[in-house]
């Protein structure tokens, strides 16, 4: 069974929308370009004739959500919510594993560190047009990373590395990582955030 959460407010929203569709229409949750930096999640109507034998059905009160077998592992721990604030209402879909498949706790250190970078660190850097890639982990337990995009040449990169990335990684990999170092040649340019 899949670990996809649809909040009660989102379930009510979907039930209302589906009430205006032909009988038997449900929803489909999917990932386009799963496992890549260009991964995008979506929700669409799913008429009965669009259901495939390999789809996973997640039943809810009044409707079902269908997920194709390729998207399923990338939607692990996904949450769909319908939030209302002063600005209006919107559907939110958080899928922390859309760009990279979740790795097991006993996976090699390099895979676990790469997973944390792609799912926790890079989404924060993306707001500034930046990203970081894991280059290697040395025998001494030092994670060597390279910054790219808006982070390359940014004057705040040292703070981001020490106060953000290193603190996060050392916290999550106690006893396995000893430090995080930057391998990037920082040339300031128009692309730099600060």
Curated annotation (Swiss-Prot):
Keywords of this entry: 4Fe-4S, Iron, Iron-sulfur, Metal-binding
UniProt cross-references to Pfam families, sorted A to Z: Fe-S_biosyn (PF01521), NifU (PF01106)
Cofactor(s) listed in the protein's UniProt record: [4Fe-4S] cluster
Gene3D superfamilies found in the cross-reference section: Fe-S cluster assembly (FSCA), HesB-like domain
Cofactor remark from the record: Binds 1 [4Fe-4S] cluster per subunit. The cluster is presumably bound at the interface of two monomers.
Disulfide bonds listed in the record: none
Domain of life: Bacteria
Gene Ontology terms: biological process: iron-sulfur cluster assembly; protein maturation
Entry annotated with the keyword Thylakoid: no
Secretion signal span: none
Binding of [4Fe-4S] cluster, residues: 151, 154
GO molecular function, one term: iron ion binding
HAMAP family linked: Fe_S_biogen_NfuA
PANTHER family, alphabetized: FE_S BIOGENESIS PROTEIN NFUA, IRON-SULFUR CLUSTER SCAFFOLD PROTEIN NFU-RELATED
Protein family (similarity comment): Belongs to the NfuA family.
Protein purpose: Involved in iron-sulfur cluster biogenesis. Binds a 4Fe-4S cluster, can transfer this cluster to apoproteins, and thereby intervenes in the maturation of Fe/S proteins. Could also act as a scaffold/chaperone for damaged Fe/S proteins.
Quaternary organization: Homodimer.
UniProt protein name: Fe/S biogenesis protein NfuA
Lineage: Bacteria, Pseudomonadati, Pseudomonadota, Gammaproteobacteria, Vibrionales
Gene: nfuA
